[in-house]
Amino acid sequence: MLNMKSFALLMLFATLVGVTIAYDPNGKCGRQYGKCRAGQCCSQYGYCGSGSKYCAHNTPLSEIEPTAAGQCYRGRCSGGLCCSKYGYCGSGPAYCGLGMCQGSCLPDMPNHPAQIQARTEAAQAEAQAEAYNQANEAAQVEAYYQAQTQAQPQVEPAVTKAP
């Protein structure tokens, strides 16, 4: 375990050599502390965790401080965007999807554009897979019948001569 003095020295050293430590050992998050571990959200009070106390807060947009273009602040994004596990704001499965979101996640907002987009993309992928399976099955049936037709001996009808 690191004591505070060791931790401070480690942070100073990391800053001097240009290394950043991804996670705060005390579970804090936000601009000063960094991001939460995968699967966790940054609460409105700047602590990492999971569940509605951490992930379902509604920080007013005025409290979300501007950051570098497209980056999250305390696990939150303005404009209704999701904060990805990598600390960037956006919409769609890469930002809002299960296991991809660290904050401003939208599991309980089924009509949010990002959720609609994620469902639409999933439905399109499922429809494409179904169409492929049906086409593949039809091709297999056609090949089977062609093989059966070619394998059967051709019998010519008997020709009868008139007396």
Swiss-Prot record:
Residues 58-67, 100-163 form a propeptide. Residues 26-66, 69-107 form the Chitin-binding type-1 domain. PROSITE patterns: CHIT_BIND_I_1, CHIT_BIND_I_2. Residues 1-22 form the signal peptide. It holds the Pfam family Chitin_bind_1. PANTHER family: CHITIN-BINDING LECTIN 1, PTHR47849:SF12. This is Antimicrobial peptide 2. It comes from Stellaria media.
